[in-house]
């Protein structure tokens, strides 16, 4: 069973997706093999760029412009990629970011809640090292879709190695792996198509290189704004009664007569990857192998 019933549904979905933005990262690229391990000054810190569906990347300046001057704390109830929450953190506000999806939660823990923890070069080499004890779930269940030959096994290996980490280091690694799986040459940035058009063409070596870059970028985004920011993973109806803030920002999934964006199905691969599909059951007759929700 395909995610979209008609071509019109698929087109509506794609029209909601922001195009990926290029990031000028020459300063960090020049330091090949050396991760940023301490806080960068604001003018040296890279922008947080995302191509997550519905991202307000292009609107963060407008959102800040319309934020009242006396606001000191903000709740982002559907944080998604975390781009708005991160913007508010850079402005010195206390941020409470919430999202039901695990990938979004790990992203928020990595760059919103996290104040000073970063991956080291040794951590990165460990994550990319061979692991004969790694599982084969991705290789066994997603063969031929989403990624080029050899990448499925590499994802299994990196994911197994991530379990050797704890705390914010693990969040950074999961965030980086998810971002790497979403991006690359080809593909739509999500996992709604099993056709060749939905397959990323990167070789295993190119995947490793992008994973390294994503770790470097995330490391560089980590900073302490002097406020206790928090990431949560709760149903919004449970989350809101528990928190207090000067401002509440709401950007929920959109449902219209033309489209109902199901983020969990669109990003089912990275969502499953966050727990290595523990407790999840794949829909075997689905071409995209999404799990039951």
Tell me the role of every PLM-derived stretch.
Residues 63, 74-88, 97-102, 241-262:
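Conserved proline-anchored active-site loop of SAM-dependent methyltransferases
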């Amino acid at each position: 069973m395909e995610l979209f019933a008609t071509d019109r549904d698929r087109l509506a979905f794609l029209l909601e997706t922001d195009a990926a933005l290029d990031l000028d990262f020459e300063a960090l690229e020049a330091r090949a093999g050396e991760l940023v391990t301490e806080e960068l000054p604001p003018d040296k810190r890279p922008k947080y760029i995302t191509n997550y569906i519905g991202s307000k990347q292009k609107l963060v300046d407008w959102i800040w412009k319309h934020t009242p001057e006396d606001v000191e704390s903000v709740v982002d109830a559907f944080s998604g990629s975390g781009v708005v929450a991160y913007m508010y953190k850079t402005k010195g506000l206390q941020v409470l970011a919430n999202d039901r999806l695990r990938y979004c939660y790990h992203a928020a823990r990595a760059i919103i809640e996290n104040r000073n923890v970063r991956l080291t070069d040794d951590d990165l080499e460990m994550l990319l090292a061979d692991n004969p004890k790694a599982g084969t779930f991705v290789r066994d269940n997603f063969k031929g879709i989403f990624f080029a030959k050899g990448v499925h096994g590499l994802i299994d290996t990196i994911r197994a190695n991530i379990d050797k980490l704890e705390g914010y280091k693990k969040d950074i690694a999961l965030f980086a792996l998810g971002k790497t799986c979403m991006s690359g040459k080809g593909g739509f940035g999500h996992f709604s198509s099993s056709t060749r058009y939905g397959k990323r063409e990167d070789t295993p070596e190119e995947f490793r290189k992008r994973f390294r870059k994503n770790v470097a970028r995330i490391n560089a985004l980590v900073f302490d704004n002097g406020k206790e920011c928090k990431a949560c993973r709760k149903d919004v109806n449970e989350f809101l009664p528990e928190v207090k803030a000067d401002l509440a920002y709401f950007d929920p999934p959109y449902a219209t007569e033309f489209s109902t964006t199901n983020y969990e199905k669109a990003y089912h691969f990275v969502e499953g990857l966050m727990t290595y599909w523990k407790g999840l059951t794949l829909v075997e007759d689905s071409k995209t192998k999404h799990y039951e929700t």
